């Protein structure tokens, strides 16, 4: 009997909701990236997008150390000469906490042809609410040591 090789339509996708309140940003990103890729499933294959949908709520309450809020920089470039913009993570957390969490999760995903397809299954919201109640998302608990 030949070895089973999963195909694109073989997997059923679930919806998970992760509450980011007091969760360390890196641990949140690893857990979300593993769910998005489907590494928790026995039918995981790196060449097939078999992952689940992930909703992250309360992105504004994620745990980041004060030193990183002050010193860690996020860079963006406009494309023009001298167009490099540097902002601290603290400044970005005040304006767009969902983008900080999304950038951390996307950074943990592979950089290949499937990456955009995997990224499209990620939804990040700064507040406690989300518009995906019709999909009946299952709460996903991140196990961590108390800080």
Curated annotation (Swiss-Prot):
Pfam families: Ribosomal_L13 (PF00572)
Segments passing through the bilayer: none
The name this protein goes by in its record: Large ribosomal subunit protein uL13
Stored HAMAP family: Ribosomal_uL13
Lineage top rank: taxon: Bacteria
Cellular component GO terms held in the UniProt record: cytosolic large ribosomal subunit
Subunit comment: Part of the 50S ribosomal subunit.
Region forming the signal peptide: none
Record keywords: Ribonucleoprotein, Ribosomal protein
GO MF: mRNA binding; structural constituent of ribosome
Family (UniProt): Belongs to the universal ribosomal protein uL13 family.
GO biological-process terms attached to the record: negative regulation of translation; translation
Keyword Ribonucleoprotein: yes
Function statement: This protein is one of the early assembly proteins of the 50S ribosomal subunit, although it is not seen to bind rRNA by itself. It is important during the early stages of 50S assembly.
Claim: Ribosomal protein is one of the keywords in the record: yes
Coiled coil: none
């Amino acid at each position: 009997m030949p070895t089973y090789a999963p195909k694109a339509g073989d997997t059923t996708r679930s919806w998970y909701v992760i509450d980011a309140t007091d969760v360390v940003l890196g641990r949140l990103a690893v857990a979300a990236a593993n769910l998005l890729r489907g590494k928790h499933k026995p039918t995981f294959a790196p060449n097939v997008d078999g992952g689940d949908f992930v909703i992250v709520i309360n992105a504004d309450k994620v745990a980041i150390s004060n030193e990183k809020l002050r010193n860690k920089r996020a860079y963006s470039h406009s494309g023009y000469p001298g167009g490099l913009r540097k902002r601290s993570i603290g400044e970005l957390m005040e304006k767009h906490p969902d983008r900080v969490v999304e950038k951390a999760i996307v950074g943990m995903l592979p950089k290949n042809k499937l990456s955009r397809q995997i990224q499209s299954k990620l939804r990040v919201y700064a507040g406690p609410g989300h518009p995906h109640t019709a999909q009946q998302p299952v709460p996903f608990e991140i196990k961590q040591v108390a800080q």
